[in-house]
Amino acid sequence: MRNVTLVLSDGTKFHGKSFGYDAPVAGEVVFNTAMMGYPESLTDPSYAGQLLTMTFPLVGNYGVPPFTIGESGIPTFMESDKIYVSALIVSDYTEEYSHWNAVESLAEWLKREHVPGITGIDTRELTKVLREHGVMMGKILFDDEPDNIPEADYEGVNFVDRVSTKEIIRYNEGAGKKVVLVDCGVKANIIRSLINRGVEVIRVPWIYDYTGMDYDGLFLANGPGDPDMCNDAVEVIRKQMSMSKKPICGICMGNQLLSKAAGAKIYKLKYGHRGHNQPVRMVGTDKCYITSQNHGYAVDASTLDKDWQELFVNMNDGSNEGICHKENPWFTSQFHPEACSGPVDTYFMFDKFVETLK
C-alpha cells in the first residue's frame, strides 16, 4: 500500500494508506454514520463529487456482491450501475471478507472502477473536524507524487446533469397506472419500490418536459449537489402543477425541487445528514420514525407558500424532512423511505403515493 495524505481545505492533514485505485483525487469531504451498506452507498448517485468517509471503523468485512440485473431491468444488489463517490475514506479496511454472496473484495472493486480508497485514517477525528467546521473540500495526495495535485469543484457544479439518464426508459411496461419518474440521480430501490406496487415507471431525464405525456402520477427522485442548479426542472414542475392536480411525490432532491416550485428557499446544512439513524416526526402527530438519509441541503419551511405545510421535521436539528399541499395530493420526504440500506419504517410513503393514483 502506498502512503497517502488527505488534505482538507483548511490545511488539516490526515495520513493513511491507499487500498483502492492509485490516483490523486479531490472533492467535498462528507461522512456517513451507517454501520453497513457500503455497496449501496458507493453506488448512490447522490454521492457524486464527494469523498465519502465511513465513521464505522471496520469496512470491507463482507466483501462485494455480484453486479447482476434483475427481471425488472435494474441492478439487484447495487443502487446504480457504477460507483459514484470520488473516493472512499475508512479507518480500518478489511481485506479478508466473508459473506455467502460476495464475489470480490472492496479493494478489487474500487480498483476495477478506478475509485481511490484510503485506510488508516483517524475517521473519528476527521468526523469531529467536519462536525465542528462543516463539510469542506479535500484532496487525496500520494506522498511519492507531491506535485501531482488534483483540482475539483463542488459548489456551482450541476451534478444532476452528470448522473441523470439521457433517454426515456420504461419499466414494468403495461402493468397499470403510469408514473413519470424524474431522474435526478435515482436509486434503483426507488424504481423497484414502485414496480413492486404494480405501476409502470417512465424514467425521464431531469430536464425533460413531461407535461404533455400520458401518465397518472409524478415522482421526483433523489440526486446529488445543489438543487439551485436545477431551476429548469423546477419550472417544469410549476408548469405541471398549473395544468393538473395529478399526484406528486418526491424524495430527497425531489423534496427540495418541489419545495422550490412551492416558493421555498434552500440552504446548505453545516455537515448534512448521512446515515441510517435519523429520527423524524410527522407534523401534527406524536409519531417518530427512524430513517435513512443522504443530503447536504435543506428546505427553509418558513418560506413555503401559504398553500403548503411541513409534513416531517428532523428531531435532531429541527430541519425540514418533507412537505405537503393542504388540498392536492402533493407530498415529499427529505429522507429515503426506500432505504437500501437502512430502516424501512417509512416504506408506507410508496403505498400512500400509489393509493392516490387510483
Task: Name each region found by the language model.
Residues P116, K178, P247-C249, K265, ...:
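Proline-centered loop/turn at the N-terminus of a beta-strand
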Residues M213-L218:
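Short acidic/histidine-rich motifs immediately flanking catalytic phosphotransfer sites
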Residues K287-E327:
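Catalytic beta-strand/loop cores that center a nucleophilic Ser/Cys/Thr
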Residues G322-K358:
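A glycine-centered loop/beta-turn motif at secondary-structure junctions
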